[in-house]
A protein has these predicted regions:
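Short Gly/aromatic-enriched secondary-structure transition segments
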Residues: 64-73
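Short amphipathic, basic-aromatic surface patches that mediate peripheral association
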Residues: 54-59
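Extracellular/periplasmic metallocenter environments
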Residues: 100-149
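Short, flexible loop/turn segments at beta-strand junctions in immunoglobulin-like
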Residues: 43, 60, 119-123
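Short beta-strand and strand-turn-strand segments in soluble, beta-rich domains
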Residues: 90-103
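N-terminal edge beta-strand
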Residues: 22-50
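Bacterial N-terminal signal peptides
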Residues: 6-16
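Extracytoplasmic/periplasmic copper-protein system
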Residues: 21-30, 72-93, 137-149
Length: 149
């Protein structure tokens, strides 16, 4: 009888472990030389694991036209965040003083490259801005919103 209980407990435990670690949901965003994201709104559940893939479909050299996705905390002013990082090329145009506002970020992608970041959607429902930090891209409209419910 004890063996049956142990086996039953192991079966229950293995089932709860496999459901506790859900694989991340993949979301793909394209970017181009026109400084636009292919997707500007992402919806996620609070605490949901996300794999965010950025596909650069441009043709201009990476030194002139790279793209990334930086997800910011609620309450962060994207325009001020971008302005603060304009001279920080070595940190992907993210001011060290503003790095605590970043929830997740991809590396820069050049033409034909795909980059990604895996993160957990915030636990707090709300609207989280995301931006491209490459110089001039946010101002050209390269921005969007992660909506967490």
């Amino acid at each position: 009888m004890r063996v049956v209980r142990v086996v039953f407990a192991l079966v229950l435990l293995s089932g709860s472990l496999s459901s506790a670690v859900a694989p991340p949901r993949s979301i793909e965003i394209s970017a181009n030389d026109e400084m636009k994201y292919g997707v500007t709104e992402i919806r996620a559940k609070a605490g949901e694991p996300i794999r965010l893939r950025l596909v650069s479909k441009g043709t201009l050299p990476k030194i002139a036209m790279a793209h990334n996705v930086v997800v910011l905390k609620i309450g962060t002013d994207p325009a001020k965040f971008i302005a603060a990082g304009m001279t920080n090329r070595e940190t992907d145009f993210i001011a060290p003083s503003m790095s605590s506002a970043v929830i997740a970020k991809t590396p820069f992608a050049g033409p034909g490259e795909t980059v990604q970041v895996v993160f957990t959607a915030p636990a707090k429902p709300g609207r989280y801005p995301f931006v491209c930090t490459f110089a001039g891209h946010f101002q050209a409209g390269m921005k969007g919103t992660l909506i967490v419910s």
